[in-house]
Amino acid sequence: MYGHLSLSALSLFAVVAAAPFRESWLQPRDSPVSQLFRRTAPDPNSNDYMSYYPGPGSTPNVSTIPQAWLDKLATVNLPNVPVATPDGGRPTYPNNEDDGDSTICSFTDQCRVEDDLYSPPGEKIWALSFDDGPTDVSPALYDYLAQNNISSSATHFMIGGNVITSPQSVLVAVKAGGHLAVHTWSHPYMTTLTNEQVVGELGWTMQALSDLNGGRIPMYWRPPYGDVDNRVRAIAKEVFGLVTVLWDSDTNDWAITDEPGQYSVASVEAYFDTLVTGNRTQGLLLLEHELDNNTVEVFETEYPKAVGNGWTVKNVADAFNMEWYLNSGKGNNDVVTTMSVAGTLTTATPTNTSTYVASSTAASSASVTDSAGVSIASAASSEASSSWAIANRPSHFVIAIACGLALAAIMV
């Protein structure tokens, strides 16, 4: 009977047949299908770009935190460590609890845990990193890194508020191959924040960096002032899969001033010399900054000395033989596994116009474990850019028409 149908009739059949497919494709927001899609990153060139994030310069309001992040937090069995109180730059704990004991384990008191990254393995490996970017001097630093072919050998621990105010600088670092990591949203003493505030500081910075780096989710974070304890470590690791990165030597480049008797460019460089030009062979993970001209000058002076003395610079991930990102391998061009921050799959919504909605992990998602041993939710499919793939996916309407035409050719 089909042999007598005209081509136009078969095409019409294809159009009609396509309707149920399109209806099933347009799933409600809370359906498992929609939960599989990555959030669409806002355009950093658009006038409303910053409206998709909390305001810079202060801890994000808890009301801006996606519910999925809070739901994940609720599943974490946190250690019994109280919130610390700010006390002149050294957070203190109730009842004069010892912040250096194994229960609290604050790095302010030089306490570390096994999972912390502290000194890289291997001889004369310099795990190169810069905190506090992007800033006004970041372009000059990035130019120097590029000129010396070491852009991909540097980890940039970026402040979320700086990221959204200077997205073009971040894009320069990404294009050059720089490794992006988290330095919180507003650079607070993290142990003095509530659990929810810790989530906001970390999660929003991860989201802002991911949005500018093809959906790659940061895997590493460095606590401002080195202020971290076991409660904050647990939130970073169990909610977001973040690895805590500390340092084995503070260059004090951040403290350089013109005041007599204080740190100067010359004194910081003199200390730097003892690390990279002496007989030391143990790996280095230094505290350095892309903060101002002084910090950049120190690095540009010391880098040639280190190389001349046999040191090899690597970014933090490579120095510890680990992956760069939670959902990608090494580099900013590796394939991205479809997932989003805290294993959720969401759509961007301006935070100043409506509540940010983040879906929970879809039932059809697979549980995978990253190299740090953290279980994260990852969609079963892997696409280099799922948002691109979705936007360019042939519609069922088109597919149905094509099938109808093919059927017509066979039947005639």
UniProtKB/Swiss-Prot annotation:
Observed phenotype of the null mutant: Inoculation of live or dead cells in mouse leads to an aberrant host hyperinflammatory immune response and host death. Triple knockout of CDA1, CDA2 and CDA3 results in an absence of cell wall chitosan, melanization of surrounding media, an increase in capsule size, sensitivity to cell wall (sodium dodecyl sulfate), osmotic (NaCl) and heat stress, and avirulence in a mouse intranasal infection model.
Residues binding acetate: 131, 225
Membrane topology: Lipid-anchor; GPI-anchor
Positions where lipid (GPI-anchor amidated serine) attaches: 387
Induction, per UniProt: Repressed by the antifungal agent caspofungin.
Region described as Disordered: spans on this chain: 82-103
Keyword set, alphabetical order: Carbohydrate metabolism, Cell membrane, Cell wall biogenesis/degradation, Chitin degradation, Chitin-binding, Cleavage on pair of basic residues, Cobalt, Glycoprotein, GPI-anchor, Hydrolase, Lipoprotein, Membrane, Metal-binding, Polysaccharide degradation, Signal
Active site, per annotation: 131 (proton acceptor), 289 (proton donor)
Glycosylation sites: 61, 149, 279, 293, 352
Entry annotated with the keyword tRNA processing: no
Domain NodB homology: from-to ranges: 124-314
InterPro entries linked to this entry: Glyco_hydro/deAcase_b/a-brl, NODB_dom, Polysacc_deacetylase_ArnD
Primary location: membrane
Chain positions recorded as Co(2+) binding sites: 132, 183, 187
Listed Pfam families: Polysacc_deac_1 (PF01522)
Signal peptide: 1-18
GO CC annotation, single: extracellular region
Catalytic activity: [(1->4)-N-acetyl-beta-D-glucosaminyl](n) + n H2O = chitosan + n acetate
Propeptide stretches in the record: 19-39, 388-412
Biotechnology: A strain lacking CDA1, CDA2, and CDA3 is a potential vaccine candidate; inoculation with heat-killed CDA1-CDA2-CDA3 knockout cells in mouse induces protective immunity to subsequent virulent fungal infection.
Recorded GO MF terms: chitin binding; chitin deacetylase activity; metal ion binding
Necessary cofactors: Co(2+)
Cell compartments where the protein resides: Cell membrane
Summary of the function given for this chain in its UniProt record: Hydrolyzes the N-acetamido groups of N-acetyl-D-glucosamine residues in chitin to form chitosan and acetate. Chitosan is required to anchor melanin to the cell wall, for maintenance of cell wall integrity, and for proper cytokinesis. Chitosan offers an advantage during infection as it is less readily detected than chitin by host immunosurveillance mechanisms.
Similarity comment: family membership: Belongs to the polysaccharide deacetylase family.
This protein's name: Chitin deacetylase 3
Lineage of the organism: Eukaryota, Fungi, Dikarya, Basidiomycota, Agaricomycotina
